Amino acid sequence: MKILFEEYKYKPEELPSLEGIDPIELKDGGVKLPYVGYYYDVASAETIFILPKVFIIDSLAFNRYDPELLCKSQSAKEPLSADDQAFLFSLSAWLYQAIALFNERHPSNEITSPRSLAGVVGHKGKDDVTLLDHVLSLLRFNREHQSLFTYIATIKHTGQHRIHWTKTIRTTTPLVKGKTPYYLECRTKDKTVDYDEELICFFYSTLDYLKQSYHFVVQRHLNYKTEKPHRIANMIECGKGTRYLRKIRGKYFKDELVQLWNLLYAFYERAEEVAQKRVPNERLLVRNFNIVFEDMIDCLIGESELPKGLKEQKDGKIIDHIYRDKSLVDDDDIYFIGDSKYYKEGSSFGENSRYKQITYAKNVIQYNIDLFNRGAKSEYLRYRDELTEGYNPTPNF
């Protein structure tokens, strides 16, 4: 896994192979990438994430690392800690999912076209799934089904090593002292193949293999016996993963285990195609990631059905995000305003931008007061106190 940064100046020879992606050439001979997102190079089996430029602080990635270090294999002198590696994967996966969800929310956005709404480019269509999608699905299953793994392990070990008295009495001769028999060779329950555990061991073997490339943290509270990562890599290279899964498919009927089998089969099928170079390079990249970020924030906190005149105000102003939340002074709801268009990178916060931000709140307050004065019967938020006639403070950030 390699990490690049949007708009950071690299030397041409420092960039990994990015077929189909043209970096911007600078006058001094350097190059920079105008994208944020995910790229998988099939030829080198290398996963590449391009992170937003906002993470470059004082020419350092996260104010700690030389960005050029993160686009190379780790050196012995400057290795990343395990926590840093896990953080980089989590952040990169989050950005990838944000772009993918943006594409789903905007079906008219032609993802293979650089002329789309936010400049999204890639091979990932509506029904396409990348190798990273399969990895994230396996991690999600592990996170959400810890109780299943614990239950199967508990059932398996219940009664294990317990004496099988019927078999012991039938097959062994006791030592009799007085009238009391003593059995010196006790028979225990025969160990049978646990097919549930067989699938789970294969699942964790797969996660251990992927952990070498993506450096994520795997939650595993039980000590399942797993295969070495190089054995899993060999199975993928030889196409044995899907053959093995087809062989054991008929042994699973529990819904969760059938789901796990399907996830594993989908991953190995894709991984074997990649290993045999039968698929194109994967990419999901976006220009102007701030547009994706704004859309994500609006999806998380924005109101889907707002009265006309609140988001698009009468004086021509358009609020980025507006939503209902509890008032700061009582138990009623009021509108919270979130808008950052006057706080752009590199610009200072002056009187002009402060006035425009305040105008947003004044317009929202006036909108509700007008409804109150007209005696409108439709639901509206009360912004004037009945006793003091003072205005309810409106958060504006």
What label would you give each PLM region?
Residues 1-49, 273-397:
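Catalytic core segments in nucleotide and nucleic-acid processing enzymes
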Residues 1-242, 256-274:
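Terminal, charged accessory segments of proteins
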Residues 185-200, 250-254, 283-291, 346-351:
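Short, charged/polar micro-motifs that form catalytic or ligand-binding hotspots
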Residues 240-298:
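Loop-centered beta-sheet repeat module
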